[in-house]
Amino acid sequence: MATNDEKSKALAAALGQIEKQFGKGAIMKLGDTQALDVESISTGSIGLDVALGIGGLPMGRVVEIFGPESSGKTTLTLSVIAQAQKAGKVCAFIDAEHALDPIYAAKLGVDVKELLVSQPDNGEQALEICDALVRSGAVDVIIVDSVAALTPKAEIEGDMGDSHVGLQARLMSQALRKLTGQIKNANCLVVFINQIRMKIGVMFGNPETTTGGNALKFYSSVRLDIRRVGAVKDGDEIIGNETRVKVVKNKLAPPFRQVDFQILYGEGISKNGELIELGVKHKLVDKSGAWYAYNGDKIGQGKANAMKWLAENPTVAAELENKIRAELLANPEQALLADIETNSEEKEDFE
């Protein structure tokens, strides 16, 4: 018995030393559902906010969102900006890809008149602008789109066939060493969008990797893997994407949760669709056959009609959202178990 007590004391001392050296949340038990008390910004997806464990993306931290082309990376970040602006936050978008569409951003709820936008000429300029905005202490959310487009100045000024091995990785490593402490002090959320590349010659295991070296993987408090897993159809017409996001790293709550939601073209994340699905799953919305009911009142036959009813009754939708958030964020283990059950069913169906 004494041996177990000594082990417990030694473990507690080791955990205390690790947290003292590397910060709160550097190590935790996977089953520990107690999330850190950190200010967060909603992603616009209720399910993803719950999967993150703290109600959204954390302020004062670095976040990486990566995935294949057309998976919804920029849409998700624009949704974060829209939610941040609603909360009175100042947002900036560093558009290294030179591909930001202000009309599409406005459709997602972004106040484009108040959004700070920069289209830098090279990677060094982009990261210097990011550093200056963070140091100002006046900007709350900064999106960098994307790491792959942060081309080093030497590569731009060189000839097309020149070799520039490791330049971008060194640039990112140096920038993140400078930025991380300032981001924490300024309580600013910095989100890096990243692309996926294939490692050559990988016979076993996952050949996918992200650009820009390993520094961003280490410095990120949250890493989100976003994928398009299907199409949303209205009859024969495709009107959106079925999207799956997996939390592959999380320093603020247990990681490895995943969530599915819909991204509708020209509209963004389908919040009302999530309200219906999560409401039914957690018995806040009743489903009988094709009919959906809330508080004993029928709200529509079929999911599309129920979503339309919620869109026409925003007060009720807000009430339902608050109930779902209160229940799931108060009991994150319930949401985690529901995810595990869902994933198990999907695997059985696949087999």
Swiss-Prot record:
Keywords carried by this UniProt record: ATP-binding, Cytoplasm, DNA damage, DNA recombination, DNA repair, DNA-binding, Nucleotide-binding, SOS response
Pfam families, alphabetized: RecA, RecA_C
GO biological process: DNA recombination; DNA repair; SOS response
Binding site for ATP: 67-74
Primary site of residence: cytoplasm
Keyword DNA-binding belongs to the record: yes
GO cellular component: cytosol
CDD domains, sorted: RecA
PROSITE patterns the UniProt entry points to: RECA_1, RECA_2, RECA_3
Subcellular compartments: Cytoplasm
GO function terms (MF aspect): ATP binding; ATP hydrolysis activity; ATP-dependent DNA damage sensor activity; damaged DNA binding; single-stranded DNA binding
Role played: Can catalyze the hydrolysis of ATP in the presence of single-stranded DNA, the ATP-dependent uptake of single-stranded DNA by duplex DNA, and the ATP-dependent hybridization of homologous single-stranded DNAs. It interacts with LexA causing its activation and leading to its autocatalytic cleavage.
NCBIfam families registered for this protein in UniProt: tigrfam_recA
Protein name: Protein RecA
Taxonomy of the source species: Bacteria, Pseudomonadati, Pseudomonadota, Gammaproteobacteria, Pasteurellales
